[in-house]
Amino acid sequence: MYMLGSLCKEAVAQSLMSKLGCSSVMQVPKVVKVCLNMGIGIGAMDSKVMDSCSRDLALISAQKPVVTRARRSIAGFKIRKGFPIGCMVTLRGKKMYEFLDRLINIALPRERDFKGLSMSQFDGHGNISFGVKEHISFLEVDYDKIDKVRGFDVSVVTTAKSDYDAKALLTELGFPFVN
């Protein structure tokens, strides 16, 4: 299942060296980390909802998520400072490549109305962020044990200097792009 990591070090690096005009393998952009964030909002006050979301994110990422808390009180949203509002995971190394492999080959093709990623989802510094609408598109999540279908955010951080370089890297890895 760890095919994407070895592919990245061998074939992708050689291909990107010729495409981007890099003189050394060390200049080739790489994926540094993948951050997954599941915001629950006001529902996080219920411990059952929080446990369910944390369990689902742990199944998807194969790593225990950390609970995110509100930084300040917002009366309009009825939250106070320190209230749990979601959970997040940062993946690096082998687990990161395993997750990306499952995301590219299994989850994104199963996503409803998914046409591909667009250039507007890049941040200008070579990183891309997008949302997964249904967490049940991952095979690890048992459909019978979930209480509600939730989505989560995925941020892929790379060492690329520009969005063009990052798109070239992610295209070589197999990410589907619209244009």
Swiss-Prot record:
Q: Which SUPFAM superfamilies match?
A: RL5-like
List the keywords (alphabetical): Ribonucleoprotein, Ribosomal protein, RNA-binding, rRNA-binding, tRNA-binding
Q: Does the keyword tRNA-binding apply?
A: yes
SS bonds (residue pairs): none
One GO BP annotation is: translation
Q: Which domain of life is it from?
A: Bacteria
State the similarity comment: Belongs to the universal ribosomal protein uL5 family.
Q: What is this protein called?
A: Large ribosomal subunit protein uL5
What is the organism of origin for this protein? Anaplasma marginale (strain Florida)
Q: Recite the lineage of the species.
A: Bacteria, Pseudomonadati, Pseudomonadota, Alphaproteobacteria, Rickettsiales
